Amino acid sequence: MQIALVETTPSSTNFERHFDFEFDRFALCSDSSKRKILKRDVDIEIDIDSYDWLILVGSEPFKHFTRKSSVTEYNGKIIDDKFLALINPAMIKFKPEAKKSFDEAVTSITGYISGELKQVKLGEDKCYGIQDKDKVMEFLANAIYCKDYDFIALDSETSSLYCRDGHMLGFSMSYEPEHGVYVDCDVIDEDVELMMQKLFNEKRVVFHNSKFDLQWFEYHFNFEFPNFEDTMLMHYMFDENPGTHGLKTLAIKHTEYGDYERALDDWVQAYLKNNGILKASFSYDLIPFEIMKDYAAMDAVVTFLLFQKFENALQKNDKLMW
């Protein structure tokens, strides 16, 4: 197995003491005097196809190889089945609290390379789209009569940020682990609405950022939610730091599904480029159902899993229960 470690510029950091495997060491820029690396400064010579794994240390190598901007968000995680993110250990000198995160990332990276950890992807029989009324009714009935869990996860995909400015494209739902669907809103009629409301009356409904989703379900369908939860607010109980509460961030940190929206993000970027559209002008109604369904369904799957984890943790801590 061939492994490479890439840092921003050559340094004296002893990475060998953190890993028990051999690796080749590279620098994105060979000039160690550079403080800020520009595109023209990158002179690394590496054939990434010759390596099974690339450990990317710090934000510059991470951004160069993955086109992602936040190495902290992906710290210790896998991207594109090849790249492993690691925060720069130099930051521990002025931010000692980062040591725990660094050590956990080292353990995670070692696990991926050894094969003990794997990024999971659900099959089409577990995560899929629905555009048929009978199938929606069957799914909702199964959700109502499932006695193993007293909650469901619910998410919405919309054409705009504000409910008065657009329409709901579809909703995602999960009523059991590792099983989620994305339903096209075109199949919602009076029968489906009645069945959905029955479900909402009988079980707790879990959102991630309920402030957003509630307005859409209430404004466009007049749904009522007698008992709902919010995994975003729950996470604030554990970590009040800003920028750490998004669903994607939490999925990467707390689940084995990782950055499951990566392919969707790539599709959007390609669409913008091919059609000459600015990102600010893009809306989700431009994404075909067949492209959207798998990723939207995963939102509900992840929300369901996060709620299980967070509620269990809260129940074990009397100081966090309300």
Residue spans of the language-model regions?
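Conserved RNase H-like, two-metal-ion catalytic cores of nucleic-acid enzymes
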Residues: 5, 17-26, 120-253
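Metal-dependent phosphoesterase core characteristic of DEDDh/y 3'-5' exonuclease domains
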Residues: 66-75, 79-93, 102, 106, ...
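Mixed-charge, glycine-rich, non-catalytic linkers/tails in nucleic-acid processing enzymes
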Residues: 118-126, 225, 265-322
